[in-house]
Amino acid sequence: MAKTYRVGIIGCGGMGHSHSRAYTKNPATELVAAMDINEGSVKTLAEEFSIPAVYTDYRQMLEKEELDIVSITTWQGVRAEITVAAANAGVKGILGEKPMSASLGEADDMIEACEKKGAKLVIGHNGRFSATSTEIRRLVADGAIGQPTLVHHRAKPNAGLLNTGTHAIDGWRYILSDPETLWVIGQTSRTTDRWERRTM
């Protein structure tokens, strides 16, 4: 008989619901625990998806539950500490939302902890799997549109590099098969949210 993977959701907002829906459609996964600092949010998610155990502290959840997988769908400011704690607790599959963390140093800490404990860390850059991205990648690989030499991406107003810019960077890296970067130029303005400016 195939293994059923025990899943915990950390962060019960919109993306927590999205991840929960996906897990309920996969016969190899079982939602066993959910955590959010907002008690109302975690109870709502647990009721909607029949999740038996609810927590308002991720440390307690990681200590009490034997989880195979966690989805971390919190605000990016706490993803690094939760990822490191999950790896240290023995969780072998960690799915995080984008952006991965609030800084490069935190991202390095996450990777190091997961490598040390043998955990697989995946960041949910779902934009690369769109039909448009897949077709553009095929056209580039086939040489149908020539060899791209420049990528210009304009973000939506107030979208921010940290919030949605990671989709653009990941998408172009995917489409262009991770080419060697020769040089980069960028422009920023002071119209982004304060928390986003602090991370640059």
Region locations from a protein language model:
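Beta-strand-loop-alpha-helix segment that lines the small-molecule cofactor/substrate pocket
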Residues: K64, D68-I69, W75-Q76, A80-R128, ...
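Short, Asp-centered acidic motifs that coordinate Mg2+ and/or phosphate
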Residues: A33, A53, I69, G93, ...
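Conserved SAM-binding strand-loop segment of SAM-dependent methyltransferases
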Residues: I51-Y58
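Rossmann-like dinucleotide-binding domain that binds NAD(P)(H)
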Residues: H152-M200
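Structural detector of well-ordered beta-strand residues that form the stable sheet scaffold
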Residues: Y55, I94-L95, V122, V151-H152, ...
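Glycine-centered tight turns that cap/initiate beta-strands
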Residues: A28, E66, A144-Q147, E180
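N-terminal Rossmann-like dinucleotide-binding module
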Residues: M1-F49, W172
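Rossmann-like NAD(P)H-binding beta-loop-alpha module
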Residues: A131-V151
